[in-house]
Amino acid sequence: MTSATPQPGQLIVITGPSGVGKGTLLRQLRQRHPELALSVSATTRPPRPTEVAGVDYYFVSVEEFKAMIAAGQLLEWAEFAGHYYGTPRQPLVQLIAQGKTVILEIELQGARQVRQSYPQARHIFILPPSLAELEHRLRSRGQDSEEAIARRLAQAETEIAAAPEFDVQIVNDDLEKSLIALETAIFSPAP
């Protein structure tokens, strides 16, 4: 386990295809490093059975989400798989001002938007070992239709092609090794 201290007040952007294991990695990371702050996104999608409102996401209606966009309350937002996702601006700004290291897990389009506002943020891309393994993981979740899985896999190919845009790429083929690589990326001094 890496024990170095991250740079105060920094933003870490984590992106990767749906089903790549971002959530699992972040849960493990937070257990090891409770000092890290996790940005909570807003979404219009319904909660999954294990998700907690206000902890995993702020679950809002499409109308509420559009009002947040109109009021400039979102740092970034995107539509993905038929639902809206976005990052409420004010909590993120407050956490960074308090010197916290904030982890922001978002989709590719959102990561590109954040780079415009926070060019100094560290951008990390989580890759699957292969598309076949990604498909296996998506099917194992048992929550998507065949059509949704096909859509997510097609989107994954586009996202994977963008991985070189990111400061660090981590192939999530072994949880512990991936977690160590993620810790190294977060806690190492910026180049």
UniProtKB/Swiss-Prot annotation:
<feature type="binding site">
    <location>
        <begin position="16"/>
        <end position="23"/>
    </location>
    <ligand>
        <name>ATP</name>
    </ligand>
</feature>
<dbReference type="Pfam" id="PF00625">
    <property type="entry name" value="Guanylate_kin"/>
</dbReference>
<dbReference type="InterPro" id="IPR027417">
    <property type="entry name" value="P-loop_NTPase"/>
</dbReference>
<keyword id="KW-0418">Kinase</keyword>
<keyword id="KW-0547">Nucleotide-binding</keyword>
<comment type="function">
    <text>Essential for recycling GMP and indirectly, cGMP.</text>
</comment>
<dbReference type="GO" id="GO:0005524">
    <property type="term" value="F:ATP binding"/>
</dbReference>
<dbReference type="InterPro" id="IPR008145">
    <property type="entry name" value="GK/Ca_channel_bsu"/>
</dbReference>
<keyword id="KW-0963">Cytoplasm</keyword>
<dbReference type="GO" id="GO:0005829">
    <property type="term" value="C:cytosol"/>
</dbReference>
<comment type="similarity">
    <text>Belongs to the guanylate kinase family.</text>
</comment>
<dbReference type="InterPro" id="IPR020590">
    <property type="entry name" value="Guanylate_kinase_CS"/>
</dbReference>
<dbReference type="InterPro" id="IPR017665">
    <property type="entry name" value="Guanylate_kinase"/>
</dbReference>
<dbReference type="GO" id="GO:0004385">
    <property type="term" value="F:guanylate kinase activity"/>
</dbReference>
<protein>
    <recommendedName>
        <fullName>Guanylate kinase</fullName>
        <ecNumber>2.7.4.8</ecNumber>
    </recommendedName>
</protein>
<feature type="domain" description="Guanylate kinase-like">
    <location>
        <begin position="9"/>
        <end position="187"/>
    </location>
</feature>
<dbReference type="InterPro" id="IPR008144">
    <property type="entry name" value="Guanylate_kin-like_dom"/>
</dbReference>
<keyword id="KW-0808">Transferase</keyword>
<keyword id="KW-0067">ATP-binding</keyword>
